[in-house]
Amino acid sequence: MSIDKNLLKKFTLLYVEDDDVIRVELSQLLSNFFSMVHVAKNGKEGLRTFLENQDEIDLILTDLNMPELNGIEMIKKIRTIDNKIPIIFATAHSDSEFLAEAIKLRVQEYIVKPIDVRYLLSLFNDIVSNLYQEFLLKQQREELEKYKEIINSNNIVIKTDTHLNITYVNELFCEISGFNSEELIGKELKYLKYQDMASDIYTNLYVNILNN
């Protein structure tokens, strides 16, 4: 598959590897693709680096067998802080015990050494594509909430479906009508006609909804 370098450049990677040669070579290569690559030489340093930069680190690539703190133990500690950050394990092992432990830690992928760089980049590409979609959805939800706040603070708002069943009312409408949203959502618009709402207000609402 093609690698979206522009997309990868929006993200920051934590790379943990105890082999000096592999760490230097791969980190230099990955720096061409990511916005930033934080590098650590063992699990203890990797954990410290994550704690110091957790607000900007988007995903983790880590070796399994390392001195001081191995990859499994490091990720266990990271998972107590962030249970969603995507993780890829690089390992020379593919035994069932490791896989079971990785599943418990919600590891997205694992890659067997020696690392196939193109395959690794394709894994990264899939992960950041999902992260970016989640970001866009979150951004849309936040913008919608801001829009609702603006609308709610300045206008009386009532929405209906094509059958004139009430689907949404804002706080200002509730204050004026004397109902709460739970009492109104799902009711037919004409429900208001038989309550205490003034007939001229109901008529204006009805006409405006039909015209819009």
Regions found by a protein language model. Name each.
Residues I185-M197:
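PAS-family sensory/regulatory domains
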Residues V157, L164-T167:
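Conserved hydrophobic beta-strand signature of PAS-family and PAS-like sensory domains
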Residues F173-L184:
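PAS/PAS-like sensory domain cap-loop motif
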Residues M66:
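Receiver (REC) domain active-site loop signature in two-component systems and cognate sites
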Residues N42-E45, N70-K76, E188:
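Acidic catalytic/metal-coordinating carboxylates
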Residues N6, F11, D19-V39:
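Two-component/phosphorelay signaling modules centered on CheY-like receiver
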Residues E73, S94-E109:
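Alpha4 helix (beta4-alpha4-beta5 surface) of REC/receiver domains from two-component response regulators
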